[in-house]
């Protein structure tokens, strides 16, 4: 009888501990979504669950662009962005083999995104990487930022969505720079450039606007897709050779 009572008491104690631990974890997660940017920085950048998968490909020059030696490759190793970086509007220049694409980044509206993308750019993460996807019907975007060119590559951290638009017609107008993701809070390095007004689910962080070079993206889209169709690898090879941030 005494043994039964002791076992029952032990089980009750374990259940109370489990409930207490679960509530404590939830409270910690909730707190991480409040407060100033610096205090949240250590929790906002989380390790992704996917692993980059290199993709073999043959790259050839196309009229209008110079030859590139960029090929799919494993991303360089990077740490986490520096929380001390100033949160300011910045100008990114994508130096591509087809010419420069310049855009203003919205550092005040998309704080974590601009800090993260500036960090990756300055680390050389995007250097010699291929823009791996273009769409030509329904939505009109060129997708870049994945060194593996597989659509699954990314840095060793993710961060939350910011500056999302409403669900209005053409909520992603031409010239928009937005983050690609695989669900809420999974932003990494992949981004897309909208070359024609498009309507998408309001789930993709808008963090910049093209000021020069949108004609290059339109030219890449007009060249079509490898194997045909309206969504796939650009027939006109375009690579980001380097990125400068001012």
Locate each region found by the language model:
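Cyclophilin-like peptidyl-prolyl cis-trans isomerases
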Residues: 6-7, 17-246
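Bacterial N-terminal signal peptides that target proteins for export
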Residues: 1-10
């Amino acid at each position: 009888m005494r043994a039964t009572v002791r076992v029952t008491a032990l089980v009750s104690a374990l259940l109370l501990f489990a409930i207490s631990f679960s509530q404590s974890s939830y409270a910690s997660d909730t707190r991480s979504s409040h407060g100033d940017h610096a205090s949240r920085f250590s929790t906002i950048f989380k390790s992704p669950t996917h692993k980059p998968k290199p993709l073999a490909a043959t790259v050839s020059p196309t009229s209008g662009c110079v030859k590139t030696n960029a090929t799919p490759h494993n991303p360089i190793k990077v740490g986490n962005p520096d929380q001390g970086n100033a949160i300011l509007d910045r100008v990114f220049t994508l130096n591509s083999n087809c010419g420069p694409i310049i855009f203003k980044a919205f550092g005040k509206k998309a704080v974590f995104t601009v800090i993260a993308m500036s960090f990756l750019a300055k680390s050389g993460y995007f250097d010699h990487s291929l823009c791996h996807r273009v769409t030509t019907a329904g939505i009109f975007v060129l997708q870049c930022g994945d060194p593996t060119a597989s659509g699954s590559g990314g840095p060793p951290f993710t961060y939350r969505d910011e500056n999302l638009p409403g669900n209005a017609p053409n909520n992603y107008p031409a010239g928009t720079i937005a983050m690609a993701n695989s669900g809420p809070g999974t932003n990494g390095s992949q981004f897309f450039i909208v070359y024609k007004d498009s309507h998408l689910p309001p789930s993709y962080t808008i963090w910049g606007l093209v000021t020069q070079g949108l004609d290059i993206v339109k030219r890449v889209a007009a060249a079509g897709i490898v194997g045909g169709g309206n969504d796939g690898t650009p027939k006109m090879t375009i690579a980001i050779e380097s990125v400068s941030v001012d």
